[in-house]
Amino acid sequence: MKRALISVSDKNGIVPFAEKLVELGVEIISTGGTKAAFEQAGVPVTGIEAVTEFPEMLDGRVKTLHPAIHGGLLARRDTAEHMEAIAAHDIKPIDLVIVNLYPFQETIQKPGVTLEEAIENIDIGGPSMLRSAAKNYAAVTVVVDTADYDTVLTELQEHGATTFETRQRLAAKVFRHTAAYDALIAEYLTDVTGETFPEKVTLTYNRKQVLRYGENPHQDAAFYTEPRAIENSISAAKQLHGKELSYNNIRDADAALKIASEFKEPVAVAVKHMNPCGVGVGETIEEAYLKAYEADEISIFGGIVALNKEVDAKTAEHMSKIFLEIIIAPSFSEAGFAILAKKKNIRLLTVPFAGNVEGFEKTSVNGGLLIQANDALVEDTTSYEVVTEKQPTNSEMKALLAQWKIVKHVKSNAIVVGSDKQTLGIGAGQMNRIGSALIALEQAGEKAKGAVLASDAFFPMDDTVEAAAKAGITAIIQPGGSIKDKESIAMADKYGISMVLTHVRHFKH
């Protein structure tokens, strides 16, 4: 290895790396700020202008886009015609490229960033050099990640060259890196133009964690997160205590966070298998948790609980009495954390709560991807319609609105029975609506008397209303829209139940 081209925006570790290369007899070629850093550190360096015999121009936009650089990178060492061609133009081969790119991701995440600032942080020369070097990995070593410095140096020191396997691995990493870089730029500019569903979608995610296994032990899995952080999400969670999250933990925690984000008042949400098993609302977070626990004392065991307020000592004492997989909250008081951290198997996570996340959700199908807007519609309650003779009381309306926030997060067909303070029965995932209703009503038992019922979609028949009436339900909220709405309304009138139509459906598959 005789020549290395180094041009980096992240200069961590680059000076000692270059010093080791010089000790190995490698000539260093560099540009701009990287060259200045080497000169300041006393590292011998050749400026890019000396190689290209052409000055940097356009405020640095053009400096390495030159045949003297790319010829030296792309020439196949095993092809005589290539080597003769570059020799004829006095171009020398470049054996090692160390490049990392302008910080586009970091730039667009800055508050108040302008489009001009974003565009100026789109790297052109860097990806070009990386791709040229990676294409010719048979002869050229290319490094885009500072984590690979030690591997490359060790091989050079021990063997005088890198192995083919290492060069191939690093080349693959480069193409992943440049593809992700371009995907993020495309996503950002697409957002700027306002296009919702462009003709091509290129997604990029960063691996956060290799998981022990997936949904089941025989399934391999990993957790990837979006480059642009979403604050109120499991991907932004900070783990304070406990062992690593599992695949199922992450999915359940995501579901719990979405429900908890629906409420401004203190709320506690218990989730099992991505469905809520108990939701409680209170004046304090302690009261909210107790309501969630009372909602289903059996199912909450081994579940995930999300709370939208700080977990204090009193709440922690209650929670420590049962086995919970995960507790998620904006924060834990010092005393609350100390109480819960005594349990080594519990996972404690903090997430900043900022309301429901707008944007898009993605669902994979074999051979494709479905993309839709998140179900984060801010509904105009003034457009809700009371269609029965009986009007809901103020307390009933409060309960209806609370359960309406919850039912949208239950797997369809979804029925939730509850009050303004808690869920009392949840029927999820049944193939017919009356089946879910009967489960929810049975779970609520005697507590159904005087409670309300929420349905994520319309009633195809009046049987759900009749079952609700016989259980003691006094008010119902549902989207409406069935050709048999009149029959359901008539059944509600027959039993003196109030019914509110929202005209908004919330299927969840």
From Swiss-Prot:
Species, as recorded: Listeria innocua serovar 6a (strain ATCC BAA-680 / CLIP 11262)
Domain (MGS-like) ranges: 1-144
GO cellular component, as recorded: cytosol
Gene3D superfamilies tied to this protein: 3.40.140.20, Methylglyoxal synthase-like domain (3.40.50.1380)
Protein name according to UniProt: Bifunctional purine biosynthesis protein PurH
Record carries keyword Hydrolase: yes
Gene: purH
Keyword Hydrolase: yes
SUPFAM superfamilies per the UniProt record, alphabetical: Cytidine deaminase-like, Methylglyoxal synthase-like
EC number: 2.1.2.3, 3.5.4.10
